[in-house]
Amino acid sequence: MEFKVIEGGICAAKGFKANGVYCGIKRPANDTPNAKHKNDICIFVSDVVCNTAAVYTQNKVKGAPILVTKANLEKSGNKAIAVIANSKNANTCNADGVEKAEMMCEMLANELNVPKEQVVVASTGVIGQVLPIEPIKAGIPDLVKGLCYNKNLEAATAIMTTDTVKKEYALEFEINGTKCH
């Protein structure tokens, strides 16, 4: 089988929309009202419920998003329709992490009108800090409103921490004469 690298990231696959915005999870110390900020939260949404698979850390210390995602996939029979992810804060090793991860899933589910068990959550960033939920709550309506089949770069930018390259990749291949992405 031959694979071809293509543009589009998550949006290269038919039926997947994405968006990323800045909501203010961690404001810079020298923040000004007109400052340009890097996106810090994103969503990926499928047109239909998808079968899912997940690989989890074997580490004894697991972040709240991992625990919530695992529980949601168990409840949904490994089905998901959306992912919500943030940067700047790993939501790991803090007292209310699970509650905040569950809230992220529930808020997005309510905005999309889907079961919360079909939403999975991811966080990347600093470990051990409390995740501020209010900026996320305020940002979710804009995320959903701006969902589009070509906003993969906005979403990829939102999950960058100290990375210099966006975390996205898309392939094209053929199965029985049908092109797949």
Predicted regions and their residues:
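Short, well-ordered amphipathic alpha-helical segments that serve as non-catalytic structural scaffolds
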Residues: 61-74, 98-112
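Interfacial helix-loop-helix linkers and transmembrane-helix boundary segments
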Residues: 75-79
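Glycine-rich, mobile lid/loop segments that gate access to catalytic sites or pores
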Residues: 99-103, 107-181
